[in-house]
């Protein structure tokens, strides 16, 4: 399942390519056809993310609520007038591109970003956000949603309810509502006897945080994953600020890098990490390998159905 930075990055790309434009909306697969017809020919005002949830706000005051789940993908691809490949639940392209003129395509930087894929386990799959398709500077693009957990049409009031179910999002650090949620999360943290590793994965506490950021933040701060929430709350601001920093980097660069400069491949004269997830990390999916800081073996356990990684020496 993609972590929150992937969804925020996707929202940014959708706004860059389609924001403020009149859109053609369809459901080639057919499962969203009736809803698509209600927003076809209307303006996409904005795409915005909260945690792992994506909201596409149309001028008709109707909102498409998307959650990719474990296998969903939302790709920005070259526009083609015939039916796109695969089981496309939702298809978007600019109305002006039906004539093939003046399309706004991805920037070179965005094209070079390539596919962003995340996986919750070591198996193949995951969620892709952006295809590394070769495009000319004025080639039309489309957005195609495949295999989501949710794709539904909701009202503004229903969107507010959905956001109200979520916790604080580290990628919305200055949002007034999010700041209120953050303070409430901190209050709940001080009363919780659950482990901090469990709380970090709870979307009602930390919206958008997934398995990778959970493991890496706890390592970077030297916190034992079994530490109770009420104990870890003494370091709540450190946890929050590290999440803000790491997830903002992930949103900007399209990959998760968590190692500090002194532990980079160049500084340590070691080979770069080779993993489908990409990026340099301390413990995630490094079970049995030497810790980059102390040299002891990275540990692994399945906790609440999810893989947890930590260094028993650095995280006492």
Model-identified regions with their sequence ranges:
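Extended, highly charged segments
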Residues: 1-62, 89-98, 105-111, 117-118, ...
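Catalytic cores of large soluble enzymes that bind and process phosphate-bearing ligands
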Residues: 2, 177, 235
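Basic, nucleic-acid-binding surfaces and adjacent catalytic neighborhoods in DNA/RNA-processing proteins
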Residues: 22-35, 127, 132, 185-316
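Phosphate/anion-contacting hairpin/loop surfaces
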Residues: 64-209, 213-222, 227-228, 232
């Amino acid at each position: 399942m993609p972590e929150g930075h992937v969804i925020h990055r996707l929202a940014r790309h959708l706004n860059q390519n389609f924001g403020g434009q009149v859109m053609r909306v369809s459901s080639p697969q057919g499962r969203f056809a009736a809803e698509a017809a209600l927003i076809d020919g209307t303006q996409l005002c904005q795409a915005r993310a909260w945690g792992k949830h994506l909201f596409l706000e149309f001028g008709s005051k109707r909102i498409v609520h998307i959650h990719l789940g474990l296998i969903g993908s939302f790709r920005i691809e070259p526009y083609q007038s015939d039916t796109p490949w695969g089981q496309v639940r939702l298809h978007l392209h600019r109305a002006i591109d039906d004539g093939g003129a003046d399309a706004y395509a991805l920037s070179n930087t965005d094209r070079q970003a390539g596919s962003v894929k995340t996986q919750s386990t070591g198996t193949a799959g995951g969620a892709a956000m952006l295809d590394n398709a070769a495009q000319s500077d004025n080639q039309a693009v489309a957005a195609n949603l495949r295999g989501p957990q949710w794709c539904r049409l909701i009202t503004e009031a229903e969107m507010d309810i959905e956001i109200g179910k979520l916790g604080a999002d580290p990628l919305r650090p200055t949002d007034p509502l999010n700041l209120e949620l953050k303070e409430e999360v901190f209050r709940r943290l001080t009363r919780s006897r659950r482990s901090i590793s469990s709380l970090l994965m709870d979307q009602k506490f930390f919206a958008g945080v997934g398995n990778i950021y959970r493991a890496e933040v706890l390592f970077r701060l030297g916190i034992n994953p079994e530490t109770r929430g009420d104990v870890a709350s003494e370091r709540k601001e450190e946890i929050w600020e590290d999440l803000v920093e790491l997830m903002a980097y992930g949103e900007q660069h399209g990959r998760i890098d968590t190692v500090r400069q002194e532990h980079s491949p160049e500084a340590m004269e070691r080979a770069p990490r080779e993993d489908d997830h990409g990026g340099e990390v301390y413990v995630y999916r490094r079970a049995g390998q030497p810790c980059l800081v102390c040299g002891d073996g990275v540990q692994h356990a399945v906790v609440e159905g999810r893989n947890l990684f930590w260094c028993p020496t650095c995280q006492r």
